[in-house]
Amino acid sequence: MYVAVKGGEKAIANAHALQENRRRGDDTLAELSVAQIEQQLNLAVDRVMTEGGIADRELAALALKQASGDNIEAIFLLRAYRTTLAKLAVSEPLNTAEMRLERRISAVYKDIPGGQLLGPTYDYTHRLLDFTLLANGETPPLRTADAMQDAAPHVFSLLANQGLAKREEDSGAMPDDITRTPPVCPCSRSSRLQQLMRGDEGYLLALAYSTQRGYGRNHPFAGEIRSGYVGLETVPEELGFAVNVGELLMTECEMVNGFVAPENDAPHFTRGYGLVFGMSERKAMAMALVERALQAPEYDETVTGPAQDEEFVLAHADNVEAAGFVSHLKLPHYVDFQAELELLKRLQQEAARDD
């Protein structure tokens, strides 16, 4: 039972003013601009865009500033804003094989068509605090060269050409849209991928880690991780042909997972897939691992771990929903607690009489 309580309007206004003052911090210091957040906290912006469901770096940076750097609050702000937007068009499927690469690595083949590209990464740093950033924050000038990129087909397409993996085929079915129709388990793969993309990174990371510790049959290799710019196209009704309307910075991960040996088919590797906005590589990898774990029923695998339980995974992945439900405990529950209190006192009195 929930009790509607009207709080003091003045107290609430004062609380908001205090929060705004705390957000701003010491006013003798220069205020952090949205442009600075967008450029210098770019990985935080990437996460807010991915889980907020809007590919707009400026809006994601604004949300982070308004939320004092609280990722989940920023994601909530972006989701709320998204509900006010009209759906203008539907884009064509993204062709990630033609991605203008910023980074591309494979853990299964050293030499791949198009080559590997290390790109920007923290992977090989020593994780030591860089105190020079306290002094001036200057970075040395970066030497660049003209971009020259060879064709870079997906590693999984190479496996498929050798008969070692199934080729992904487009069924032609219209993908689900979880923003318009609430998902219901069992979910289609399109619905599942959308929910995982919007799911909380920490939650998916923990589930992905659990699959590596024996809670679910999953033996993965990072087949390919690629980050870069993908062209975005749409087909206007009045034109009837695709028009490029921009590009998106995205990260894609395909995990090569343990093989299966169906009765009516040749043994082959399976795959898990992850796709996110920006350079959120860790999220893409976690998403791919969990996505494969959720395919257990399709391969007649025994569901033994939490990451393989579709209803459990997807029902608890949304951090906005989770934060909202946990936060509601801060609301007054006076009547509920009073009922529990009266019951406890009555039980204590009955126990005392029995003694």
Please provide the spans of the model-predicted regions:
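Short, amphipathic alpha-helical interaction segments embedded in low-complexity terminal/linker regions
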Residues: 1-227, 241, 349-355
